[in-house]
Amino acid sequence: MSWQAYVDDQLVGTGHVIGAAIIGHDGNVWASKNLSLKAGEGAKIVNGFKDSASVLSGGIFVDGQKYLTIKADDKSIYGKKGAGGVVLVKTGQSVLIGHYNETIQPGQATTVVEKLADYLRENGY
């Protein structure tokens, strides 16, 4: 399955995120739908997994929007803005990003992104 197919089918296609992307550990976008990282955001996202204190204090930027970080460690970062938010999960080679709005329960978005990340980890990605 292509990276774009993972984004289209396993993330956005579930209806539990409205936008998604998969980026490499270098910050470059591998695939995306309804989400466009601005210049430098990918690298800052990847760095956030190494330096959780910086994203906990300064928030996380995705698609030009700043999100209040509510959880950050070396595996996942959760951000909130109003009733929407973002879920970012790191695997061995990539970072999955899911964006949800007020019509989606945060837990639903988190489950979809974390589940795909677990699958990719189990398969060496």
UniProtKB/Swiss-Prot annotation:
UniProt entry keywords in alphabetical sequence: Acetylation, Actin-binding, Cytoplasm, Cytoskeleton
Question: What name has this protein been given in UniProt?
Answer: Profilin-A
The record, for PANTHER family, names: PROFILIN
Q: Which family does it belong to?
A: Belongs to the profilin family.
Compartment list: Cytoplasm, Cytoskeleton
Q: What lineage is this protein's organism placed in? A: Eukaryota, Amoebozoa, Evosea, Eumycetozoa, Myxogastria
InterPro entries reported in the protein's UniProt record: PFN, PFN_euk, PFN_sf, Profilin_CS
User: What main location does UniProt list?
Assistant: cytoplasm
Q: PROSITE patterns this protein is in?
A: PROFILIN
Q: One Gene Ontology cellular component annotation?
A: cytoskeleton
PTM-bearing positions, type N-acetylserine: S2
Assembly and interactions? Occurs in many kinds of cells as a complex with monomeric actin in a 1:1 ratio.
Q: What does this protein do?
A: Binds to actin and affects the structure of the cytoskeleton. At high concentrations, profilin prevents the polymerization of actin, whereas it enhances it at low concentrations. By binding to PIP2, it inhibits the formation of IP3 and DG.
What residue stretch is flagged as signal peptide?
none
Q: Name one GO molecular function term.
A: actin monomer binding
